[in-house]
Amino acid sequence: MRGNSDPVFLFSYFKGHGDGLHLAWSGDGLTFEALANDQPLLTGVAGPEKLMRDPFLSPANDGLFHLVWTAGWHGRAIGYASSPDLIHWSCQELLPVMGHEEDARNCWAPEIFYDEDMARYIIYWASSIPGRFPQTDHSGDEGLNHRMYYVTTVDFKTFSETRLFYDGGFNVIDATLVKDGNRYLLFMKDETLDPVCKNIRVAVSDTLFEGFTAPGPPITGDYWAEGPSAVKVNGRWIVYFDKYKLNQIGAVISSDLVHWEDISDRVHFPAGAQHGSAVKISFERIKHLL
């Protein structure tokens, strides 16, 4: 019998070309079962493209679930909505996080990190601005050359100015930030096409916005991977990711962030799940969806 306070893992994802927010849950971090009969709990209506891709769900201390997502292939805004129960949702909004950058081509895969030291939320995403980092202007698909940017907020109503979050000297998307004791881990996709990388790497820092080490070697294998999401399970890090050319979710596991074992054959997700994000949460907050 699972108790209300028992920790479980909640996985948010999309299917198809961006049909909306899907959820799955797991007690062991390996086998995820779809909630709501694998139907979207929310579909995108914000923005001209009305997409909802790469949904990231943050179960905040204010009692709400805060959701951000990629609202379109193009544009300078991200999608945002909140919910107390994952059933009833606020009106969807477009947050114009790159509105000040007229040449910005996109805003992809936003995520939320809660900064406990400053009691604020950090929203970060990948954008490509032509000519901003000329040394890698021709390294990506269709001339895209991404770096990571961020804003901060305490209430999801007012936001700081947009700042550069991470520039590792290469084309990067799909970063995910987690805290490990007193240090920060930044898992990311090396989006370089020439020469082909398309893999997941990790950088480490003792401070939140600067000081990240050069990312280590790829932690994923001989396939294209994106959309990493990292959780700690029984003292070891599991990183889930989208093997998007193979149409499956993969995973690797490590106890030291150096040596990684591929456990893709041991994880199970709903068919068709794409670019998901996992968070640890109490069973009480999702049991009504079972």
Language-model features: where?
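Carbohydrate-active catalytic/glycan-binding domains of CAZyme proteins
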Residues: 1-290
